[in-house]
Design a protein with these regions (language model features):
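Signature for HUH/AEP ssDNA processing cores
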Residues: 1-167, 171-193, 277-296
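Modules that initiate DNA replication and primer synthesis
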Residues: 107-117, 127-128, 148-195, 207-425
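A short glycine-rich, hydrophobically flanked beta-strand micro-motif that places a catalytic Asp/Glu
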Residues: 144, 204-207
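Conserved short beta-strand edge segments in small beta-sheet-based binding/regulatory domains
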Residues: 195-202
């Protein structure tokens, strides 16, 4: 049996736990999500695909992997705001899929009970579906394993507390640099083949989904593969991994959508959203009814905030959900952006999808964005209050910005003639 070799990055964090934790506390099942990789080391590892099975099992709770590679085989890792010549931030600039070199490629399958979703029962079933789109995958090696959160049980009652339907399938891509294009194209073709559906979030957002997570395509993203930490009173089902020998995955064989296919894809997505429009409106109205009271803002304003979020703009009073389910508004991030740079959180529009689905990124241009890795990937732009935006643009303090804006507004008013005033009114 033959399995291709691949090089990836092993990450070790000094303090934070980089895997999921589960515990029973006073009869209640509790889960804690992985922490932030902010102070640690990176080391490149090379092995055959089948050797990943014992390797993953051997990792400690402070370790994870990254599919991309740094320039140097060994590196000290930090967050972007503390990056120096000797300390590397975990960003796309520093972790890359190298052109014409093999890289790990992951297909992530999660249980989804949304209306219209397709349940995938095994790795072989998913590969068979992909084979209808990409016949050459029939000869490609893969290793499949259950998600680290799968099969957690109560030792007292034998009750299954987490789903055991989720799994990861690993291949070795022949040309790592083509992985982002391949995943994006495969996602769209799966939707065209009838495997797309709309998940309506609690807040009424319509989120396109298919049988794989379309966002697992970024070289700097953490892959939490170490065994979950479980406390007394819990156990985990033994779910054996699956191995199939073969060769590398030639991603280039999967061609981009033609212009006609792109139009069909857009029409299909439009139809899927139309079919769930009423459900989404009901969910949104219910969400606004409850959240407007919790947040102390008007229903009209909250509706505006959510509509902006649907357009990938998160306004200053949008509520972000952190990994531990605590919340923070965008304005707090804007007030102290460097403290939030690199912080992992839940997807802005679908916090129920799980932890570590997105990351806050503070750019050198002072713009703040959230990169969501969930199901296809989205980039959200964060906007502060007008005074904070002006302060950022002018590189001044908030007090100085407030005075400058006041003077500027006075000047505008003085320069208005009567007709301008009538037009504005």
């Amino acid at each position: 049996m033959t399995f291709p070799k691949v090089t990836f990055t092993e990450l070790t964090e000094k303090n934070a736990v980089l895997t999921k934790r589960y515990a029973m506390f006073m009869g209640c099942f509790q889960k804690e999500y992985p922490g932030i990789m902010s102070d640690g080391s990176a080391k490149q590892m090379t092995m055959q695909l089948d050797e990943l099975i014992p390797y993953f099992t051997s990792l400690s709770e402070h370790q994870a992997i990254c599919h991309g590679l740094t320039e140097n085989p060994l590196a000290t890792i930090t967050v972007k705001s503390r990056e120096t010549k000797d300390r590397t931030a975990r960003t796309k600039d520093n972790f890359i899929f190298r052109s014409d070199e093999p890289s790990l490629i992951l297909l992530d399958v999660d249980a989804d009970d949304s209306h219209g979703s397709t349940t995938i029962h095994s790795p072989a079933e998913l590969v068979d579906i992909i084979e209808t789109i990409l016949p050459s995958i029939a000869n490609v090696a893969y290793m499949a394993k259950a998600s680290v959160s799968s099969g957690i049980m109560s030792t007292d009652t034998d009750e299954l507390l987490t789903s055991n339907c989720g799994f990861h399938i690993y291949f070795v891509a022949q040309d790592g640099s083509d992985i982002p294009r391949f995943i994006e194209t495969l996602f769209k073709k799966l939707v065209l083949e009838g495997f797309g559906h709309i998940k309506v979030s609690r807040s009424g957002s319509q989120l396109l989904r298919t049988v794989i997570d379309g966002a697992i395509k970024s070289p700097e993203r953490l892959d939490y593969v170490a065994p979950a930490v479980i406390s007394d009173g819990l156990s985990r089902q033994t779910i054996d991994p699956t191995l199939r020998p073969g060769g590398m995955l030639d991603t280039v064989v999967l061609k981009n959508l033609t212009p006609e296919e792109e139009r069909s894809y857009a029409d299909l997505v439009k139809q899927l959203k139309s079919d769930t429009k009423e459900k989404a409106a009901t969910f949104r109205n219910q969400y606004v009814e409850i959240k407007s009271i919790e947040l102390g803002i008007s229903k009209k304003r909250l509706m505006q905030v959510l509509e902006s979020a649907d357009r990938s703009v998160l306004e200053y009073d949008f509520v972000l959900t952190l990994n531990d389910n605590s919340t923070v508004i965008v304005d707090e991030v804007w007030s102290n952006p460097r403290n939030w740079d690199g912080v992992s959180l839940r997807d802005p529009l679908d916090p129920d999808d799980g932890s570590s689905k997105a990351m806050i990124i503070v750019g050198d241009d002072h713009n703040i964005r959230i990169n969501s890795f969930a199901h296809g990937g989205y980039l959200y732009r964060l906007t502060g209050k007008p005074i904070e935006l002006y302060s950022s643009i002018q590189h001044t303090s908030l007090d100085d910005a407030e005075k400058l804006l006041e003077d500027f507004n006075k000047k505008i008013i003085c320069d208005l003639d009567r007709m301008d005033e009538v037009d504005i009114l």
